[in-house]
Structures are given as structure tokens and as C-alpha cells.
């Protein structure tokens, strides 16, 4: 677990709209040198859905090669389709990232808790690695799909070593407060 400030790092692009790896590495190092305890690349602020899988994986790998401790990284890996989410998540594990921050599938709205549970279950089965640590990403005002308290409790109960936490960006204190009551669930509000 990373304690302290985890910065949702911006993703800089060059004039050809490719990730500017040098600037990305410099930004990451500056954030870590100036008091951040960890980084969350490719979250909402990091333009996650503007970058393809290969470029995203290369950028995270570039951070590690530049000297950023992978145990200080929680990259965003959630996408609408399961195979791409599995691929990016496996890559983060291979790099020894501390965990992954995963959105629910968000293209179809109004998905039931059962459907969302099945998605995360298939993700965990597809990755098939006991080193997998998932931080669920709850930001319904952006992705249009929320995670209910009951769903998070069920996922934590079913996969206690894998579902380790939640990033709650909903801004709804009642959600944060309820998640704080779930045993052994790490809650990152904001």
C-alpha cells in the first residue's frame, strides 16, 4: 500500500500526438522528488482513453526504465473491452507495479451489479496472477457507471487478496464513508 499523496500524473504529448516520454519521465521524477508518495499514470487526468494499449504500456515501461520505482505506480488499466484490460493489467504486473486502478466497463450504462461483478471476475481470471492488486476506480460522473457499496463488498469478500482498494472520485462522502467500513479495503478519496 502506498501511504501519502498519490499524484494522478498528466500525460504530455509531442506535436505528433505521441506520448513525450522524456517529458513524462521528467514530470514523474519531479513529482516524486517533491513529496509525492506514488503516481497514478493513465487515470482520468492522464488521458488514459486517448492512448492506445501499446503506447500506454511503453510509457509505463519508460517510467520504470527511467528509475521510477514500479512499487510506487498504480496505473489505470480499465477499458471497455476485457481483452485489452487484461493485456494492460498483465503488463503492469510484469513491470512489478504496486497495483492497477481499474474502471468498470463503461460504454453500456445501467449495467447491473451482477454484470459488473462478472466483468471483474473475468478480469481476475484472465490475468490469473496472484500478484494482481486491483484498486477499483469509482468516478461515475465521468464514466457513467458507478460501483455500488454492495458490489464493492461482494468483490472484496470474493477476492480479498486481489481487490485491495478503491479510488473514490465521486465526491459523495456517504460512499467514501461506507467504503471505509469495509474490512481491509484501502480507500483513496479524491
Question: For each predicted feature, which ranges?
Answer:
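Catalytic alpha/beta core domains of metabolic enzymes, predominantly
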Residues: 126-130, 139-190
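Active-site beta->alpha loop and helix N-cap motifs at the rims of alpha/beta catalytic domains
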Residues: 1-146, 163
Amino acid at each position: 500500500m502506498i501511504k501519502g499523496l498519490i499524484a494522478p500524473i498528466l500525460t504530455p504529448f509531442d506535436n505528433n500526438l505521441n506520448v513525450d516520454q522524456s517529458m513524462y519521465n521528467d514530470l514523474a521524477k519531479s513529482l516524486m522528488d517533491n513529496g509525492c508518495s506514488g503516481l497514478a499514470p493513465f487515470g482520468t487526468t492522464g488521458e488514459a482513453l486517448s492512448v492506445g494499449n501499446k503506447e500506454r504500456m511503453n510509457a509505463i515501461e519508460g517510467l520504470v526504465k527511467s528509475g521510477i520505482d514500479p512499487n510506487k505506480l498504480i496505473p489505470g488499466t480499465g477499458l471497455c473491452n476485457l481483452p485489452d484490460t487484461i493485456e494492460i493489467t498483465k503488463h503492469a504486473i510484469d513491470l512489478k507495479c504496486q497495483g492497477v486502478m481499474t474502471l468498470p466497463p463503461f460504454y453500456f450504462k445501467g449495467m447491473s451489479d451482477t454484470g459488473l461483478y462478472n466483468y471483474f471476475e473475468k478480469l481476475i481470471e484472465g490475468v490469473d496472477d496472484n500478484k494482481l492488486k486491483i484498486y477499483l476506480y469509482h468516478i461515475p460522473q465521468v464514466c457513467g457507471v458507478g460501483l455500488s457499496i454492495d458490489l464493492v463488498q461482494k468483490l472484496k469478500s470474493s477476492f480479498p487478496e486481489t481487490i485491495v482498494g478503491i479510488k473514490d472520485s465521486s465526491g459523495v462522502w456517504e460512499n467514501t464513508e461506507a467504503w471505509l467500513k469495509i474490512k481491509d479495503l484501502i480507500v483513496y478519496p479524491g
